[in-house]
Amino acid sequence: MSKAYLFIYDSNVGTREELKSVLNRMQRVSTWRFDVPSCFYVISEYSAQQLYDEFVSLNGTKGRFMFIEASDNRQGQMLPETWYLLTNKQHKPK
């Protein structure tokens, strides 16, 4: 079963471009998107621990970061595409 995560990081972890490359190489990541600084929305069938382990194997432990599951208890000012991804665990059809 797919889960939605927020991947939150500081600038010591890497640039957005570097992290896009890491997420694209992660076999445990189904898809992802971003629309705010220092945060990616990640979809995966794996646990936060498993995502962490794979991320560290590719990028190391530099900086501060975390994968945190996005529950249904959420609200905010986000783009419709972000809400769709978090709710449906896939990108909104074009």
Named regions from a protein language model:
Residues 1-18:
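Short S/T/G/P-rich N-terminal loop/turn motif that feeds into the first structured element of a domain
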Residues 1-5, 61, 93:
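Short, surface-exposed loop and linker segments with low hydrophobicity and enrichment for Pro/Ser/Thr
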Residues 13-31:
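Short aromatic-glycine-(Arg/Gly/Cys) micro-motifs in beta-strand/loop hairpins
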Residues 24, 57-59, 82-84:
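General N-terminal targeting signals
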Residues 29-76:
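Short, intrinsically disordered low-complexity segments
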Residues 49-54, 76-94:
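Short, low-order "capping/linker" segments at domain edges
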